[in-house]
Swiss-Prot record:
Family annotation (SMART domains): SWIB (SM00151)
Name of the protein in its database record: Brahma-associated protein of 60 kDa
GO molecular function: DNA binding; myosin binding; protein domain specific binding; RNA polymerase II-specific DNA-binding transcription factor binding; transcription coregulator activity
Keyword Lipoprotein: no
Length: 515
């Protein structure tokens, strides 16, 4: 019965039916092979039976061992997803668990079933990274002090969540303009140079002239960062500067001195104007601030209504919306419409308008902001330098913004954290390895004989997979192996296959074809 036969051709349709299988019987394996712990098809004409490894008798914890509960045959078959694939993959030479064919098929099934998107992979990688830092429950039971480490992990997760939330808050805050008001002190000085007559020594004479300087600097408010070394240039606060001199003295073509910002403008610490003259000069200095973001001056009627003189467009729209809500001007039925009161009707020249029309209707009511006007008097005959000071309010970037940017861009702490995480992972891996070694030697110390027996069985199973040896020759050479219930079905299947094979050969020889 242990003789090896090559599988025949596919059985043809026959009117003879195979004998019904006895309950609890298993398919007959090829000679030299034993059964894997899997299910099998009940009809013999579906596939070839699959060889495999037999259960090892007398070893606790192994399927089929007396006295040790284990899953039934069909349950074990249902638990193995590669069962049908391994059946379809068997060929003439026979192969199964021992031959490596079924193992290869199951590996392919696992590889095909494990595909996923990049986001799933990233999420799995993050979970794996977190799981690598957690100590197993057995280690925590053995070492009660390890609970302190687990508490630190919980605290670390909460801290990471808090830091991430704060980083998001900072990123949102940086999207909005962060300004603070500072005092800019403007120094306007003039120096008069009297005329000089030419001398006999060859020195040339000089015409009487005067020089006007416009300079400035930010005043320290005591709240700024003392480590800030970058100082803004005076010209960076302004969009344009115009010095208007007396038109009667310098004519219509030479009485204006203008400076306007361009994309290629080089910032400077001040402006200087020099003109000839020995008479008192009245000049007007016009300074237009460079607002970032842009600000607009409201129409006087709207400014009185909202209490806003010069502001940015979002602030103006927000103030108008507050006025509408306060006076309940929004239509009760059509919420997108606004019913203008007598003041808004005079300003917008309409009784009713949509809220979406407000920005468009505001455009004619918004004007460029007024420049800062300084009247200065240049007195002739005074050889000493005369200086006048003026303080104006300007908006500068909040110093906290630079600290926020440096916090978001800093990577030194992240690198340090990654290094510490690597050390933690290595330490946890070492602990897990020591736990495995402890269980290994503890099992050996409790029952050396049974431990070595199990070890040999495990190594034999691995060796069988590596060497592609089918079946279990040690069991097959004993008579008890063939007194199991599956032998009855195996004999029936064998004779059924041989009869079908002979029938097919006879029909082929006689030229009989089945329609």
């Amino acid at each position: 019965m242990s003789q090896r036969f090559a599988p025949g051709q596919a059985p043809v349709q026959s009117r003879y039916q195979p004998p019904p299988p006895a309950p609890g019987m298993r398919p007959y394996p090829p000679p030299g092979a034993s059964f894997p712990p899997r299910g099998f098809p009940l009809h013999p004409n579906t596939t070839q039976p699959v060889p495999g490894t037999a259960n090892v008798a007398g070893v606790p914890g192994v399927p089929g061992v007396p006295g040790v509960p284990g899953p039934s045959l069909l349950q074990r078959a249902a638990q193995q997803p590669g069962f049908q694939s391994s059946l379809r993959g068997t060929g003439a030479g026979g192969g199964g668990v021992g031959s490596g064919g079924g193992s290869k098929r199951s590996n392919e099934s696992r590889s095909l079933g494990g595909g996923g998107s990049k986001s799933d992979f990233a999420t799995a990688k993050k979970k794996k990274k977190l799981a690598e830092k957690i100590l197993p429950q057995k280690v925590r039971d053995l070492v009660p002090e390890s609970q302190a480490y687990m508490d630190l992990l919980t605290f670390e997760r909460k801290l990471d969540a808090t830091i991430m939330r704060k980083r998001l808050d900072i990123q949102e805050a940086l999207k909005r303009p962060m300004k603070q008001k500072r005092k800019l002190r403007i120094f306007i000085s003039n120096t008069f140079y009297p005329s000089k007559e030419p001398t006999n020594d060859g020195e040339e004479g000089a015409v009487a002239s005067w020089e006007l300087r416009v300079e400035g600097r930010l005043l320290e408010d005591g709240k700024g960062d003392p480590n800030t070394k970058i100082k803004r240039k005076f010209s960076s606060f302004f969009k344009s500067l115009v010095i208007e001199l007396d038109k009667e003295l310098y004519g219509p073509d030479n009485h204006l001195v203008e400076w306007h910002r361009t994309h290629t403008t080089q910032e400077t610490d001040g402006f200087q104007v020099k003109r000839p003259g020995d008479r008192n000069v009245r000049c007007t200095i016009l300074l237009l601030l460079d607002y970032q973001p842009l600000q607009f001056k409201l129409d006087p009627r709207l400014a009185r209504l909202l209490g806003v003189h010069t502001q940015t467009r979002p602030v103006i729209i927000s103030a108008l919306w507050q006025y509408i809500k306060t006076h309940k001007l929004q239509d009760a039925h059509e919420r997108e419409y606004i019913n203008c009161d007598k003041y808004l009707e005079q300003i917008f020249s309409c009784q009713r308008m949509k809220f979406a029309e407000i920005p468009q209707r505001l455009n004619p009511l918004l004007h460029p902001p007024d420049p800062i006007v300084i009247n200065h008097f240049i007195e002739s005959g005074a050889e000493n330098k005369q200086t006048a000071c003026y303080d104006i309010d300007v908006e500068v970037d909040d110093t906290l913004k630079n600290q926020m940017n440096s916090f978001l861009m800093s990577t030194a702490s992240q690198q340090e954290i990654q290094g510490l995480d690597t050390k933690i992972h290595e330490t946890v891996d070492t602990i897990n390895q020591m736990k495995t070694n402890r269980e290994f030697f503890l099992s050996f110390a409790k029952d050396p004989q049974m431990f070595i027996h199990r070890w040999i069985i495990s190594e034999t199973r691995d060796l069988k997979l590596m060497t592609d040896v089918a079946g279990n020759p040690e069991e097959e050479r004993r008579a008890e192996f063939y007194y199991q219930p599956w032998t009855h079905e195996a004999v029936s299947r064998y004779f059924f296959t041989k009869v079908n094979q002979k029938r097919a050969e006879l029909e082929q020889a006689l030229g009989i074809r089945n329609g």
